C-alpha cells in the first residue's frame, strides 16, 4: 500500500487530531470531533478488530508510513528488548523526518519529509536525504547554509511556533540546529496513540 496523498481533512475527521499529519486540525477542532463519530458509535457497537484497526491507522497516518513500512517497524520492535509498543514508538520518533518536525523546523511531518528529500537537512554536517534515516544519540540536525534552505526553514519555524520541543531534543534557534541528547520518554511521544492496540493488530502478522 502506497503513502496516502488524498485530502487530509477526510482522514482527520475519521481518526481525530493528527498534528504530525496536518496542521489544519488546529484551526477548528470541533469540525473533526463532531457528531459523526459520536452518532456512529452510539448506533452500533464497534468490533475489537475495528478498534485496533483505527488505532493502527492513526499511527500510520501520523508518521506518514506505508503499510509495509509500519509492518517492518513492528517486526523490528518485537525482536528488540523492551515492551514492543514502546520500542515501536521510539523507533518512529527517531526517524529523521519526525525529528525535523519535532524540532519545529517544519509544520508537519510531510513538510519535514520534503525538506529532507530536497537535501536541505544535515546530520552531523553531512547531507542526508532519506526521511526514514534513524537518528542516534548525539546526532546534530542542522540546515544547509544555502540561502534558500534558511528561508524555507525560517518560514516553517514561524508556522510551527505553537509546537513545543520535547525534552529529548534541544534546539539552538541562533544556529538553526538541534541535538538528539536522549531516547524519547513515553510521555513525550508526539502521537497520542494506544500502541498496545497496534501491537495486538499485528500480532497474527508478525
From Swiss-Prot:
Molecular functions (GO terms): rRNA binding; structural constituent of ribosome
Keyword set includes Ribonucleoprotein: yes
PROSITE patterns registered for this protein in UniProt: RIBOSOMAL_S4 (PS00632), S4 (PS50889)
CDD domains hit by this protein: S4
Primary site of residence: plastid
Locations listed in the record: Plastid, Chloroplast
Alphabetically ordered keywords of this record: Chloroplast, Plastid, Ribonucleoprotein, Ribosomal protein, RNA-binding, rRNA-binding
PANTHER family reported in the protein's UniProt record: 30S 40S RIBOSOMAL PROTEIN, SMALL RIBOSOMAL SUBUNIT PROTEIN US4M
Protein role: One of the primary rRNA binding proteins, it binds directly to 16S rRNA where it nucleates assembly of the body of the 30S subunit.
Protein name: Small ribosomal subunit protein uS4c
Organism of this sequence: Chara vulgaris (Common stonewort)
Source lineage: Eukaryota, Viridiplantae, Streptophyta, Charophyceae, Charales
Record gene name: rps4
Amino acid at each position: 500500500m502506497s503513502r496516502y496523498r488524498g485530502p487530509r481533512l477526510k482522514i482527520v475527521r475519521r481518526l481525530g487530531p493528527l498534528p504530525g499529519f496536518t496542521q489544519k486540525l488546529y484551526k477548528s477542532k470541533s469540525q473533526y470531533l463532531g457528531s459523526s463519530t459520536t452518532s456512529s458509535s452510539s448506533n452500533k457497537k464497534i468490533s475489537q478488530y475495528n478498534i485496533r484497526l483505527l488505532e493502527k491507522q492513526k499511527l500510520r497516518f501520523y508518521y506518514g508510513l506505508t503499510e509495509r513500512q509500519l509492518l517492518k517497524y513492528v517486526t523490528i520492535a518485537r525482536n528488540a528488548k523492551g515492551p514492543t509498543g514502546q520500542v515501536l514508538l521510539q523507533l518512529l520518533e527517531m526517524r529523521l523526518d519526525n525529528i525535523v518536525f519535532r524540532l519545529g523546523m517544519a509544520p508537519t511531518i510531510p513538510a519535514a519529509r520534503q525538506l529532507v528529500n530536497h537535501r536541505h537537512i544535515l546530520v552531523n554536517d553531512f547531507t542526508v536525504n532519506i526521511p526514514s534515516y534513524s537518528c542516534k544519540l548525539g546526532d546534530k540536525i542542522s540546515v544547509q547554509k544555502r540561502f534558500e534552505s534558511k528561508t524555507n526553514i525560517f518560514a516553517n519555524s514561524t508556522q510551527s511556533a505553537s509546537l513545543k520541543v520535547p525534552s529529548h531534543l534541544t534546539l539552538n534557534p541562533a544556529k538553526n540546529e538541534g541535538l538528539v541528547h536522549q531516547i524519547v520518554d513515553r510521555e513525550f511521544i508526539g502521537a497520542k496513540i494506544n500502541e498496545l492496540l497496534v501491537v495486538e493488530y499485528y500480532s497474527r502478522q508478525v
